[in-house]
Design a protein with these regions (language model features):
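Active-site phosphate/pyrophosphate-binding segments
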Residues: 1-115, 189-209
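Active-site proximal loops enriched in glycine and acidic residues that flank catalytic Cys/His/Asp
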Residues: 71-73, 82, 98, 120-123, ...
Length: 209
């Protein structure tokens, strides 16, 4: 949602300001991050231009009783946001799990036909996350994957469907990754006939203690 994306932008700016003030980021890296930050709106438009694909994926899976999200590091956090949005507006049971924790009980929830949304946008963690994808696939799960353009072809060899996001500086990936997750929740809710603008039992802001 707009609040989540705006908070990310504010945190980026605060982080850059502090790094510059403390001298913990060299000038070249600082300039690179700022340049990529300015390109985020354009790259978000690219994602929105491909939203028909996400709508199609939603049409395939909107009747699933449970949908699980997995990811490592910040991908896990974005998975939690995607799972939360899905629960809020589509009323589907959904949980997000750290991919590295799958073997500690979570994987017992996977059965044939279960949908797992796997986020693997960080190149350094891609192979480890994909090893978890192989584990859930071997147990019959359907997998919808999200990764950067540079690794989309590799991911497509294992998962059922891929949502690619434009490449950017690793620190800025959450701003791109979160939008397909929110769109997926939106289109799933539409398919289910839910009132997206007025989710049940939710208020726009917290007004009571």
């Amino acid at each position: 949602t707009k609040a989540f994306s705006t908070q990310l932008a504010v945190v980026y700016l605060i982080g850059l300001y502090c790094a510059e003030a403390l001298g913990t980021l060299d000038e070249a890296e600082y300039d690179r991050i700022v340049s990529e930050l300015l390109l985020i709106p354009t790259k978000l438009e690219q994602i929105l231009d491909n939203r028909a694909d996400i709508q199609y994926f939603a049409s395939l899976y909107f009747n699933h009783p449970s949908i699980f999200f997995i990811g490592r590091n910040i991908d896990y956090a974005i998975g939690m946001e995607g799972s939360l949005k899905l629960k809020e507006i589509s009323y589907i049971h959904s949980e997000a799990y750290a991919a590295g924790e799958l073997k500690h009980g979570t994987i017992s929830l996977i059965e044939p036909g279960t949908l797992v949304v796997a986020l693997a946008s960080y190149v350094k963690l891609f192979d480890k996350t994909m090893s978890n994808v192989v584990e859930v696939k071997s147990r019959g799960a359907d997998v919808l994957g999200l990764t950067v353009d540079a690794r989309a072809a590799d991911m497509a060899k294992t998962v059922d469907h891929v949502i690619p996001v434009p490449d950017t500086h690793p620190l800025l990936l959450p701003s791109l990754d979160v939008v397909p997750m929110q769109l997926f929740a939106y289109y799933v809710a539409l398919q289910r006939g839910c009132d997206i603008d007025k989710p049940r039992n939710l208020a726009k802001s917290v007004t009571v203690e």
